[in-house]
């Protein structure tokens, strides 16, 4: 059965389409108009390479060695040496989904027609993607300008039959992986090595998947907060439209609307309508303001990433219309670095306020429930250490939220004297997302135990659906047990999408 097809043209790629490629569920093809642009740019590079005029990256050295002229007979060796010398990454390989996206994003940049790649080299890249030949790319070694040189060099190694690649998940020498897939390596011609290694695609590969996950976690944070609110018999009034309209931040309005949707048809809110409590703590009452600010930060990051993945970030750039090959700075990752720092800070705020809500749940002076929600407390410790784990994750997330985008270490003998550290921002953002997911899993688990004490009165549509799904997998804690298993089980419901899907079905009929 044929798979759905995704045409790339360098201009219209969407974040959601990237997720399909990460999961290897579509066949990627080059749009005809893009193919024509690629050929025209290559023809111009060939004309320049045949002449005697110096042109960076075509017949010169690289970086600080740009003033060194290269003889025509050595142009192929120049490109090969570039790939070999720049493949200096260290650390664990990018996970397969991120490495697939890296290859896709490089193809999309080449499809714009400003890089001067040969059509047959781009065709090899697309065939690798479609036949599941995924380069082994160490995740550390990029300072984010001139783009992600080391990660992209490891990607390019496979094109020339060097390095390593995964073929259908099996790690192999690149030449063997290509052979198994029925592909042959290429010999790089003038400028092609540079066309493969200059750009921000590694930070964007990690960053786009981080962004999509962060947006999911923002929805999950609203759900966890709503579930805690119901478990604590909190008020729905702070979420009414009138309060949001007089401040009018879009993120705040979106969060409040989502909370109202989740809490609809709550019997619990009616059960304490005449209680003496006047106000809830900030971690409950101010969810629209805090979660909403995080949403706005993520909206900013999305806008930057949507532009970046469809941008020409090579250097030099090939302008066919004016027959010029011009050096510039589009490889500099500062926009992406700043955006991913903001995304990490947004996620850290979601985990920080979640941890405070867990404290509300387990503290009997605040919840009116048994200490740590334990039955026969004293003999049982209940969720005491779950809150400690959440606090530890928040503390580490705060350290990781120090912005990478304000750091810069000059390189290349001072020629590259300001860099973005965009890959650093992406990698630490990915870690923060992991921690945020775990914090929210803990809150959902603890909130479910609180709702046990409120049964049979039903919570709002969203929390009730989440509660019922969690309880179908994880029983009420009657006595102490290994909590890490329960946290992992809730995390699995989150990662699979099952939890949010169940909630959306209950609240929207989707």
Swiss-Prot record:
Post-translational changes noted in the entry: Contains an active site 4-methylidene-imidazol-5-one (MIO), which is formed autocatalytically by cyclization and dehydration of residues Ala-Ser-Gly.
Entry's localization field: Cytoplasm
E.C. number: 4.3.1.3
Keywords: Cytoplasm, Histidine metabolism, Lyase
PROSITE patterns: PAL_HISTIDASE
Primary site of residence: cytoplasm
Cross-link (5-imidazolinone (Ala-Gly)): 145-147
GO MF term set: histidine ammonia-lyase activity
Protein name: Histidine ammonia-lyase
Protein species of origin: Stigmatella aurantiaca
Gene that specifies this protein: hutH
